[in-house]
Amino acid sequence: MKKLFPFLVFIILNNTSLTCQILENKVYDLDSIIIEGVREKNIIKRLDPIQGTYIFSGKKNENLSLTQMDANICEKNARQIFSKVPGIFVYDMEGGNQMNIATRGLDPHRGWEFNMRKDGIIINSDMYGYPASHYSIPLESIERIELVRGTGSLQYGAQFGGMINYISKTADPSKKFSFENYSSFGSYNLLSNYISFGTNLKKIKIYAYLSKRNRDGYRDNEHTKYDAQGINLQYSPTKNLSLNFDYARSYYLYQLPGPLTDSMFYADPTQSTRSRNYFNPIINVPSITLKWKISPKSKMQFVSSALIGTRNSILFDKPATIQDSINRITLQYENRQVDVDRFNSYTQELRYLQQFNIGNFTNHIAGGLQLMTNDLHRTQLGKGSRNSDFDINLVDPIWGRDLHFKTQNIAAFVENNFEVTKNFSINVGARFETGESKLKGTIVYYPDNEIPVSIKHQYPLLGTSFTYHLLKKMEIYGGYSQTYRPLLFKDLIPSSTFEKIDPKIKDAKGYNAEIGFRGKYRFLQFDITGFLLQYNNRFGTLAFTDAQNNFYTYRTNIGNSLTKGVEIFLQAYWYLNNVNKLTVFNSSAIMDGRYTSGTLKSGNNNINIEGNKIESVPNLISRNGITYQYRKFSISLLHSYTASNYADAFNTELPSRTGAVGLVPSYQVVDVNTTLKINKMLEFKIGINNLMNEKYFSKRPLFYPGPGVWPSDGRNGSVSIFLKL
């Protein structure tokens, strides 16, 4: 047998070799196979329950993919970008420079009710003095947008609106070198160009971009000049440790066409009342981020960041009823008002996440510290030139207001995620804020000793949330979280000698509460949420007379409000065949926001506003869309409806002579966007905004950029070419 075995092996190997030779000498003709399909688009997802050092379990949230959208990205069209987020109120009047948005009946001005972040880095200009975000992100540089409602606020801040986090693109990990170019042109002489470069050098990744955009406006005397730059360098010495250096800058100069009265708007919404007004923010955001995966169950993140920049404003600041014309005597224009804010905001944030087991259940605890040191230097009421161009030089070196608003605040936060069963988990959290804001400086028309000098912020904030998985892809979730909002710099500055500030004035505070049902069933995706938003210590003005019978106004906390509503997101899709897909969705919010108590000055009288509706809270915001996909082509139709709402707390129906107050009429807008992906390297986008040329406005601002009607854009279109190498 031993002698036979080698012989058998030889025969087997020899036959195998011979068979291979025979096969190699034969040629087989195979039928061709065509693989057909439709390019998959999953624009909206939910955040993972545990993501990085954050706990999102039990929170209302959205995760939006910008790279898959049929939307106007270069002009930051918020109603298209956030179309699948129920109840997003869009205040669109600034030519694509800023996204003014809010949810749940809050103020949309530059997103200042949100904790605004880019890659986890705070981009609110000054969280305590002026929380508006003046940094203008080129959305071509953004991969996706994360949005978390206010019930998750304990982990990142105390804002009523919640958090918006823009997640940037990075270098393509599959390539040593990558390049992107996103060029757009369109109506109103739109020209936009975005270029990015990425590289991978073993342990180092680099991504950098340049963006430029020029655009005239829908209205006369409206123009935008914009540019932005950014660079990101990531060094990963090990797979568990990374150090990230990031610098981003944005600049834009916007020529404002001025407010209109209602009669002007209905006669011709494209006309302007100003030709010499300008707005110019220049913002720098440097940061360093350290991420360390200490063990499979432990993560740490440290961020040191700053926001440094200026906000320049040049205005002939009068109502629309007063013309900005040449004086017949001097044969010159009147002097313009110059205002300059200088932001110096610094944030240090340490976060830690620990996973631990209790029996067979996995639990997580997240905690950290946040230190903010801000100095907002505000110079206002400067006497500017009589020129028509952008010129921030003063003809008189004395500012009407020259003030510093310095804040130092520290916050400690912790949140624990407990798995009670495999399907049911509870989160319990707390945040403690302690700090102080100090105001000092001069106001030429006001005694120095009567300016409020110190405001303390000390708040213990509590919250809880839960999630219960009914089935694999369905869950009930809910939560409650306390919130607060610091008083803004502008609310503490008396506008005249006849105005006084309550020395016991308080920050606004309240809570968010919600309960929802979300998931997927066959071809249907859904998320339905009921919410309450309590907003106490709202700020306003009262009228009084002193002992000598002199009239004066008094700025103080005037009352409380409650907004309640339902947010509905429904989306269904059907594969008609291998290459055709149809998607329809509805994204709506039904809201009722009212003052539960309050008194406000009207003329020389104080009026009770209890039961009145809150400003800029429409009863219904609804967006409905349909997308048809064929192979690599898609076309999307979006219908947006916003119900009428009030511009002031008195619920004034008839417009005032200046257009500053009155009902904001309901409006509906239709947008069409298409995308054609030629191959992996080349893509075309064509869009028409406001297809039916609806003439509308979304808000009557009571302060900047001027009281009155600010028309939104009429019909306009754009073509974009996207090249990726």
Give the location of each predicted region.
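Surface-exposed extracellular loop regions of Gram-negative outer-membrane beta-barrel proteins
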Residues: 253-268, 377, 436-443, 454, ...
